[in-house]
Structures are given as structure tokens and as C-alpha cells.
């Protein structure tokens, strides 16, 4: 109610309804950079701006139903968009505030670190040059193996020289791992010997049997 008075005039009273609009509260989302972990999960923090100081202890931001995920899991130099699913809300809001949902933030995924690359069970038959082995690496995450498709480009090869093996990684590039400065581990090649057996035969002029040691199946292991 507004009352206007002046001695020269008759008192006048005017009534006016004033509508109070809810105060806008904006939410800012910040995604945290992470090291490659093979997952889409993103860590996101939220802050609310616009809540009056006198209400700050009562009206609080609730983000329990909001989750962030990267658009893809791979490492890269550029920031990636983090998609927010779910909505923020205000605890103890009696209608005095209206909440604006946050925009999708961005963050970077850096490469994980491979600490060693090695081969196990490196062996071959004594009469061949072809090696059999199992490659592995320490530092791989989320159950990934050196044999996981798309883990790297190029060819990792194991080569032998004088009974020793070395791992050649020339031209190999890992999509999500850094192995700069890591020297692949070499070692001794296990040589599988032939299994001898006795093959008997008759010699001319000798009715008895003579023996000759050869590999089983005619030099086959």
C-alpha cells in the first residue's frame, strides 16, 4: 500500500501488487583432467552462484544425480567434451530461487605410462630359427593386453642373435600410452632339444641288430 500526503491535497491511497520473481542461480561445472584409464568416467565438480549469503547455510546445491562421461576414452592433446547426465537441484529451496543447469565442461586425457616391455617363454626348436614367445607390458590399464586390438600401430618383433633375444619396437606407436625412455627387456632363448630314440637296422653280413640314435620320427621333435 502506498500512501501520499500533502497539506494542500486530500490524502490519496493507492494499492499496487508487486510480483517477486525467483532469483536465478547458475551452476558451473568443471571437469578434471585425467590420465588414461580405459574408461569414459569423468570427475566433475560443481559450484552454484547466486545464492544470497543469508541463505547459503540452508539452500545448498545437490549434484548426487549428475554424472559426467567423456565423449571417448582415448588420450589426446585437445580437451574433450564431458557429457553431463542428470540434473542439479537445490536443497531447501522454498521457491525463492530458480536453477539454471550447467553447460557440459571439457577436460583432457593424457597418456598412461608403460614402465616395461618384455617377452616371456621365448623358445625355439634346435633345428629352426622361428621363435615362439609371449609379449607383455607393465603399466597397461583396465585389463588391456599387448595383444588388445588397436593398442598400437606398427610391429613389435622378437629377434635372436647368438642365443640371445631382443625386442625391436622400431616405428611402434601406442595410442594411449607413453613409453619414451623405456628399453625393452631382452634375455636368453630357450633351445628345445630333440628327443632321441633307437632305430634298429640290420647290417650286411650280420644277422643281429645294430642300433643308431636319431631324433624321434626322423629328426622330428
Where are these regions (language model features)?
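Short loop/turn motifs that initiate or flank beta-strands
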Residues: 1-221
